[in-house]
Each structure stands twice: as C-alpha cells, then as structure tokens.
Amino acid sequence: MMITLRKLPLAVAVAAGVMSAQALAVDFHGYARSGIGWTGSGGEQQCFKATGAQSKYRLGNECETYAELKLGQELWKEGDKSFYFDTNVAYSVNQEDDWESTSPAFREANIQGKNLIDWLPGSTLWAGKRFYQRHDVHMIDFYYWDISGPGAGLENVDLGFGKLSLAATRNSESGGSYTFSSDDTKKYAAKTANDVFDIRLAGLETNPGGVLELGVDYGRANPQDDYRLEDGASKDGWMWTGEHTQSIWGGFNKFVVQYATDAMTSWNSGHSQGTSIDNNGSMIRVLDHGAMDFNDDWGLMYVAMYQELDLDSKNGSTWYTVGVRPMYKWTPIMSTQLEIGYDNVKSQRTSENNNQYKITLAQQWQAGNSVWSRPAIRIFATYAKWDENWGYSNTSGLQTKDSSGSGAFTSSRGDDSEVTFGAQMEVWW
C-alpha cells in the first residue's frame, strides 16, 4: 500500500503533463492589420479605389482594423492517418474609437482527414466551411480564384503526373427565387442557394522550376421545391482557369488566364450568382503577378492584369491595372517600400473611362528581410490622383456618365487628388 501511495503523485504528475501537452497542441494562426491615419485636407484617413475596379493597391491605403483568428488541432492520429479540426473567426471595424462593436464572421469550421483512403495515399478528405485553395494577388488584396464556403471535397489525389482535387461549395443570394401565395402574389425566398462544383489538376511539371495548374468550375442556382427563378436569370455558368507558376529569383511569377460565363461572371472568382438577371455574358482575364527577394538588399512585388467583362445588360467593363512595389532593405529588420499603382476602368455602357494613380512611400520595420516578413510596423505617406467620368447610378445601379463632375447622382468621384499619411501594423502567423 505504501508503494502504491508513493506512486500516485507520480502518476498524477504524468497525467497532468500529458494533458498539458495535449492543450499546447492547439494551433493558433491568423492575420491582422490596424493603424491610424490622416487626410491632408482634414479628417481621418481616406482610402482610394477606382470606381468599377474590383480592388485597390493596399500599401498605405487600408482604413480598417481587420483580423482573422484561427484555432485548430489534430484530434486523432494513427500512423499516417489523421483528423484535423480547423476554425476561423474574422471581424472588421472602422478604426474610429476605442470601443467598436461588430458581428464577427464565422469563416471556417471544417474537418480534414488525411490518408483515410488506403488506395489514395496522400489525399485529404474534408467537409465544412473552408478557405479552399484560394489564389490571390497580395499587393492588391485580389482573390481571382476563390470558391470558399461550406462544402466538401477530396484533394491532392496523386495521379503520378499531377494532383487532382474535387470539391463542392455553396454561396447564397438574397431573394432570387419565388413562389405564388394563395392570392396569386409572388412570395420571395429569403435566400436562394448557389452550388459550385470544382475540379483542379495541379503540379503539372512543364519546365525546370515551372508547374501548371488547370481548373474548371460549374456554378448553378438551386432554388427550393416549388420556387422558380425570375425570367432572364442566368441560372448557371462556367469558369475555366489555367495558371503557370515559375520559381525565379528567390520568389515566383504566376501567369494566369481565366474565362467565365453567365452566373460565374458576378464575382469573377468562382462564386456563382445564378438568380441574377443582369449577369448573362462572359469574362476574360489575363494576369501576371509575382514576388521576389533578389538578394539581401532588394525585393519586389508586381502585378499586371487585363479583365474584360462583356454583359448582355451592357453593365460590364474593361479593367486593366499595373503596379510595382520595390523594397530596399537597409538592415535585416528595416526597409523602405515604394508602391506605384495605376487603374483604368472603361464602362461598357457609356464608353467613358475612370482612372487613378496611387503612390505610397513607406518606412517599415519587419521581422526578417523578405518581402513576406511579418510582423511589420510601417509609417507611410500616400498620394492619389483620379479622373472619373462615369459611375453607378444611385437609383438604378446602372452605369451612367457623370455629368455633375462630383458624383452627385452616381458613385463617380469626379476629378480630384488627395494626400494621406499614417502608421499601420500588419501581422500573420
């Protein structure tokens, strides 16, 4: 009995140690940015984006506090088989006060099971809400291939010459479908589901240091029983993507070609809006972007893109953008960055153009000497000059020429310029 009692504290200590180790196994990842800024003409920091463009050059041009907080843990592992639970809660506020309340967005909650299928080694079976294999241009915060949402799939199936991924995800539109009530009046659904089915083949070796990824997405509206879509709704659509990635100069270059039709043209990224009656048409995008660390002194990010959205409603546009962000590294933790970006958006309906130049100079302290090193604290000054001749009508939402020159009746910003300055932190981990 004495021996047993003496062993008891040791057993308790071992058990506590095991429990502590399990608790420490929780993975904490995320992203956040926040800061303070001012506008030269007075007031808080303004941010600048060309009307009709889908993104903006972000250095010294972000006016919100935004964060994504991810918690995950491997819940079970036996040999090479495992289950991993992943979550993500995101929020955004306007950087106006100490206390700013907001409703957080539950962006991810999924289980990923690796090597569960013996005859498909290396594959991952997953289900739940997820950021699914997103492709983006960091310097303009632009996601050009993104079907994220609730879904399920099987990814990274090794075919020998490449890896195959299959997925189905969903996003919903407000209203969009209707039925008839007892008095023959239309009763609209609160939401109408849109389903996207995604097939990708990645890791196709094309040349030394170069790989190709090919994908096709089909999206369609899926109204509930006894509900129908409005006349003229696009109902469904396709998007095809080809992306070549080249390892070069301590970084990468990505060349992308995409083509989308009808319901897949609304977001131009892989989300479907099949209940819409104004998105029949097509989209073509040609994109080249990259990021490189040439040596201990210089780094670079860049983007060039052409996108043409041709809609039957004549509410499409032609958008092209080009920008560079060179980085000079004074020390391993201090650098200077200069971002120069230009956007031009031509209205399909009015044939008028909106354009904007934006230049930012930033002094930065970061955890390392790479263009990707974070955390970072930067002080910045931004100059933006724009000349806009069309906007979206405040009443109809259609593109219209801005005759007021001040955007009084449209979203046009007229012809003007502005200077902002401030400080910002950015971190991912």
Swiss-Prot record:
SUPFAM superfamilies: Porins. Residues 1-25 form the signal peptide. GO terms for cellular component: cell outer membrane; pore complex. Induction: By maltose. It catalyses: beta-maltose(in) = beta-maltose(out). NCBIfam families: PRK09360.1. This is Maltoporin. It comes from Klebsiella pneumoniae.
